[in-house]
Amino acid sequence: GGVDIHCHIAGPKVNTARKMRPEEKRHEAVVPRTDRTHSGTLGSVPSTFATGYKYIGMGYTTAFDAAVPPLSARHAHEELEDTPCIDKGFYVLVGNNHYVMKSIADEEPERLSAFLAWLMGAAKGYAPKLVNPGGVEVWKHNQAGNVGSVDDPVDHYGVTPRQIISNVARAANEMGLPHPVHIHANNLGLPGNWE
């Protein structure tokens, strides 16, 4: 069957979306309960049961949620456990993690590798995920802020997105993960972001 290597079916962003659209649960189509299935709701953010049934109905057998914060890993596992029919996992967000950036700034690759190995084991994640590496940290201190390129230094750490990407990729490759690092580069979706 098919493998969806990038979806959003568990974790805080999904639950926030469900809370933002409560009217959908009253008006959207439902998945009826049968002798073999649980009921579920559809809409823009389906219930866990409906998600599993729809994926298997489209021919998918595996799905990976692409963005779970480490502190939300346990709840994401509970949601995925509630999603039937398919194999599933998730990627752990690390691209703006303070400990990651501090380890890189202090030029301690062994400390970074040990931390990532511990974090992946503690969260039981499938791969580390980088989203706008360093850019989110800049935004935290200046709501209109971001990094303009992969070579702009990140406030308070003095590391660049390029250093975050290369160091996390190196550490993940050393771990021998089946999917070493999943990257959403800086300025994704903006013209000229390939530069």
PLM-predicted stretches and their roles:
Residues 2-80:
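Metal-associated gating/positioning segment near the N- to mid-region
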Residues 3-7, 63-65, 88-93, 126-130, ...:
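Hydrophobic faces of well-ordered beta-strands that scaffold small-molecule active sites
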Residues 8-10, 68, 93-97, 131-135, ...:
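Active-site beta-loop-alpha junctions enriched in small/polar residues
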Residues 20-42, 102-111, 142-159:
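Charged, glycine/proline-rich intrinsically disordered loops and linkers
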Residues 57, 82-85, 122-125:
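Alpha-helix termination/capping residues and helix-transition junctions
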Residues 65, 99-100, 138-140:
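A generic structural signal for short coil/turn motifs at secondary-structure boundaries
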Residues 69-115:
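Mid-domain alpha/beta scaffold segments of enzyme catalytic cores
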Residues 75, 107-195:
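Histidine/acidic residue-rich metal-binding segments in metalloenzymes
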